[in-house]
Swiss-Prot record:
Protein name per UniProt: Ribosomal RNA small subunit methyltransferase I
Keywords: Cytoplasm, Methyltransferase, rRNA processing, S-adenosyl-L-methionine, Transferase
Lineage of the organism: Bacteria, Pseudomonadati, Pseudomonadota, Alphaproteobacteria, Hyphomicrobiales
Family per similarity comment: Belongs to the methyltransferase superfamily. RsmI family.
Localization per record: Cytoplasm
Gene coding for it: rsmI
Length: 294
């Protein structure tokens, strides 16, 4: 029941339903999600105790079972068998969208392999909530989950992500936040723009923005923060092409087309000015003794 409205428990087709749940504020759930949870034969939960709070809040009484990283090998086949037997299964995580930093992808893969329909029921997502409030570029982003605990492995992972032309999104624990931010400064550079989302959608929600170095300094000096944390790091700035690289590009293009068109194409590819590139190409051709090719 939502307010005075009874949630209809309409029969569901046999399928695996991936139901997004609130990341903090229990009001952040869709009507479709509630209808699905109210009608599913089985609700598979990361932690049944955590999920019971949500289900009780909306008066949903359905059979629940645990499905998490430590029992996936045993619980997965049982859920597949239930699906093959004509039952509907709703998969939920403790918070947010299933499969985002949890083992649900294994169950989805098994369902697909067995020809079972998989239905996404979209809704809350902590990485997307943080990204949209960060002020960082959102046209391209990469969710990297939790960084490794060991220092060496953490730096190796960050080095691998250094040149990715997208906003990076991480989950982090409060006790490791300061250390991880320090590693990001070392591996990614301290001047990158970043944002820290903490306790998103909850009473003490906080979004703190600044450079990586400023944020690292802040959390190194502050008490250990509380709550769930999402770290967003802006993409690396595109480096200007080296003059030698531009020269090689101009000569390569000029070998296939007139100089004016080569300069025009080079301008499109590098963001440079066509006239300046044209003059540079003529200089290169004069030096090589080729003269003006038009």
């Amino acid at each position: 029941m939502v307010g005075q409205t009874e949630i209809p428990a309409r029969p569901l087709e046999p399928a695996l339903y991936l139901v997004a749940t609130p990341i903090g504020n229990l009001a952040d759930i869709t009507l479709r999600a509630l209808e699905t949870l109210a009608a599913a034969d089985i609700v598979a939960c990361e932690d049944t105790r955590v999920s019971r709070v949500l289900l009780d809040r909306y008066g949903i009484r359905r059979r629940t079972t645990a499905y998490h990283e430590h029992n996936a090998g045993e619980a997965g086949p049982k859920l597949i068998a239930a699906l093959q037997g004509g039952q509907s299964v709703a998969l939920i995580s403790d918070a947010g969208t299933p499969l985002v930093s949890d083992p649900g992808y294994r169950l989805v893969g098994e369902a697909i392999d067995h020809g079972i329909r998989v239905v996404p029921i979209p809704g809350p997502s902590a990485p997307l909530a943080a990204l949209t409030a960060s002020g960082l570029p959102s046209d391209a982003f990469l969710f990297a989950g939790f960084l490794p605990v060991k220092v060496g492995q953490r730096l190796t992972r960050l080095e691998a992500l250094k040149a990715v032309p997208a906003t990076l999104i991480f989950f982090e624990s409060p006790r490791r936040l300061a250390e991880s931010l320090g590693a990001m400064v070392e591996a990614l550079g301290g001047e990158r723009k970043a944002a820290i989302g903490r306790e998103l959608t909850k009473t003490f929600e906080e979004m703190r923005t600044g450079t990586l170095r400023a944020l690292a300094d802040h959390y190194a000096a502050a008490d250990t923060p509380k709550g769930e944390i999402v770290v967003c790091v802006g993409p690396a700035e595109a480096k200007a092409d080296e003059p030698a690289d531009i020269d090689r590009l101009l000569l390569s293009l000029a070998a296939e087309m007139p100089a004016s068109k080569a300069a025009s194409e080079a301008a499109k590819m590098t963001g440079g000015q066509k006239q300046a590139l044209y003059r540079r190409l003529l200089e290169l051709k004069d030096t090589s003794g080729e003269g003006d090719g038009g």
